[in-house]
């Protein structure tokens, strides 16, 4: 008898996927997902036969297991007065200022309470590969914090191959290590799931999210707590998200 456990099971709901699974003739299928819904265009179709659900809303209400997501914007901000490139630059500047403040707060907390120092990093969501390269160029330039992040930024996308891809994967897997110098990760729809780190503290979305599922997956990257529980210090327990008008 065969029982199939399907992680990230929202991927299995296409007709061809079901055909393959049914050919195996399992007696039971158990699905695991943080986003129990199928997005079809603008429609969101919830899963049926849900045995147990623990939603982000429940986790936030329990005030124990995840960071508190907080959206940061500017008062009286008029995006129509900026070009798309200028808007990206403003959001990146706001995001990195939040990052520097968070980095200081984490260090103060660790030294005050004798805990390991957590090295935070920023996740930047780009529209496509060309956009990602433009962001990378800007962050490495002297126009961005006088070039401070030139050797502290990495880009991950599906076009990377060979040694470059291997090096980036190695960097991603060691981002929680204080010796890893990377503080900014730019990605194009590559890290929405299956990548678990606890030290994402700032997310800068520079693309409109295509679906509610994608939004939840992206934010979900940053909700894990580095100390395994909330500390009671707002800045240590917070995930900062720089506002996007369509995110």
Where do the protein language model's features map onto the residues?
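Inter-Walker segment of RecA-like/P-loop motor cores
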Residues: 1
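Walker B catalytic acidic pair
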Residues: 7-8, 190
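Conserved ATPase-coupling elements of RecA-like P-loop NTPase cores
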Residues: 9-19, 195-198
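Post-DEXD/H (motif II) to motif III coupling segment of the RecA-like Helicase ATP-binding lobe
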Residues: 14-68
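Short glycine-/polar-rich loops that comprise or flank the Walker A/P-loop
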Residues: 25-28, 62-68, 150-151, 198-201, ...
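Conserved interdomain linker/interface between the two RecA-like ATPase lobes of SF2 helicase motors
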Residues: 48-138, 142-159
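Conserved RecA-like P-loop NTPase helicase motor core
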Residues: 159-247
């Amino acid at each position: 008898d065969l029982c199939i456990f399907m992680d990230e099971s929202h991927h299995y709901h296409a007709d061809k996927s079901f055909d393959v699974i049914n050919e195996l003739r399992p007696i039971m299928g158990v699905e695991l997902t943080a986003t129990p819904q199928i997005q079809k265009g603008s429609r969101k179709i919830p899963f049926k036969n849900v045995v147990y659900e623990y939603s982000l809303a429940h986790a936030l209400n329990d005030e124990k297991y995840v960071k508190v997501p907080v959206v940061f914007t500017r008062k009286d901000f008029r995006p129509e007065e900026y070009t798309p490139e200028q808007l990206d630059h403003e959001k990146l500047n706001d995001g990195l200022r939040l990052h520097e403040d968070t980095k200081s707060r984490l260090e103060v907390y660790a030294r005050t309470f004798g805990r390991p120092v957590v090295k935070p990093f920023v996740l930047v969501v780009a529209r496509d590969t060309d956009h990602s390269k433009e962001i990378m160029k800007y962050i490495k330039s002297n126009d961005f914090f006088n070039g401070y992040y030139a050797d502290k930024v990495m880009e991950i996308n599906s076009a990377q191959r060979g040694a470059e891809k291997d090096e980036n994967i190695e960097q991603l897997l060691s981002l929680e290590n204080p010796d890893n110098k990377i503080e900014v990760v730019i990605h194009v729809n590559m890290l929405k799931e299956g990548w678990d780190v606890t030290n994402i503290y700032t997310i800068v979305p520079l693309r409109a999210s295509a679906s509610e599922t994608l939004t939840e997956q992206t934010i979900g990257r940053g909700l894990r707590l580095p100390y395994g529980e909330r500390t009671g210090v707002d800045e240590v327990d917070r995930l900062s998200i720089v506002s996007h008008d369509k995110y």
